[in-house]
Amino acid sequence: MRKITLLLLAMCFAISIKAQNHISNAFFEARAGFHNEINDNNKYHNHFTGDFFNFQMFGNITDNISYRVRQRLNKNPFTEDNIFNATDFLYFDWKINDKWSLMVGKQEIFIGGFEYDYAPIDVYYWSGFCNEIPQSYGIGAALGYSFDKDNILYLQIINSPFSLGNKDDLLSYNLAWFGKVSDWWKTIWSTNYVQGEKDNSLFYVALGNRFEINDFYLEADITQTINNNEDDLKYTYAFVGKLNYNYRDKLDAFIKGGYDKEPICYYSAYNTPFNYVDNYTFWGGGVEYFPLKNKDLRLHCVYYYNDKDKKHNIDFGVTWKLNVVRK
C-alpha cells in the first residue's frame, strides 16, 4: 500500500512540473525523536521514535477554487471501511463571492479550541479530551460566511468523530466561528451536535481563545460537553491553557497544562465507559529552536506528565520540511 501512495506522489510531482501555476506549495514534513519515560516506580524506558511523515499540497483549480491535500505516509492508508484512513485533508474550497464560500471533501471536524486546531505534528502531548477523540477529520461540507478578512462563520455537516467507517450513519452538525475580536484576542468557538452509537449523542460548547501581547501569547480553551445517553444527561468540562514566549523568531518556550472533569471521550458516546477515569490532569513544558532563517527545521525538548499514565516523559527531537514546490 505504501508503494502505491509513493507512486501517486511521484505522479503529482510530474504533473507539477507542467502545471506549477496551479500548485502554490508542496512539501514533505517529518518528525522524529528520542523518547524517555520514568514511571512512579522509577522504572526507566527509552527508545527512538518516528512520529510523523506527511505530504502536503496546496493549489488552485481556478481563481475562485482552491484545494488542499495532507497525506500521512507512515499510517495505514486503507482500512476495510475507510479508504481515506491516512488522509487528513482532501478538499476543495470554492469562494462563491466576497462573503460566501463552500468547502467540500475530507476536512477538519470543526470543534472549538486552539489545541484541537493545531496540526498533530506540532503537538507533543494532548489534553484528555483531544487525545481520546477517535478522529478529527471527516468527509463532509462546510458553508462559510465571512464578516471580514478576520472573521468567518462555518456551518458544517460532516461524518461524526465516532463514525469510524464510511458505512456508519453518524453525522456531526457544527457551527464554528474562527474570529478576531481585537488585535490581541483571537477565537475558535463552536457549538456541536455529534451523533454516537446506540442512539447516544453529544453536545459541545467549545470556546478557544488566544491572547497575544508582544512576544507572549496565552491560549485558553474551555469545553462544556453534554452526553445524552439512554438513562440521563452527563455533564463534563475540560480546560486547557498554554503560555508561550517567542524570542526573535528563533526560540519558543512554553508551558501547557489542563484539567478534564470526567472526560467525555472516556465515557464516549456509548453506553459503557471507555477507559473511564474520574478526572484527567496533565502538565508540561518545552523549548523549540529554529536554527535556520525560515521554519523548515525545528529542534525540540519537551517534558510532560499526566495522572492517568503516571509517567514522566522527556522527548528530544527534530521536525523538518522538504519543499518540492514553493512560490
Predicted regions and their residues:
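Sec-dependent N-terminal signal peptides
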Residues: 4-13
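Sec/Tat signal peptide C-region and signal peptidase I cleavage site
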Residues: 15-19
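Loop-centered beta-sheet repeat module
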Residues: 153-200
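Transmembrane beta-barrel domains of outer membrane proteins
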Residues: 56-58, 93-95, 101, 142-146, ...
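Outer-membrane beta-barrel pore domains
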Residues: 22-23, 27-43, 62, 79-80, ...
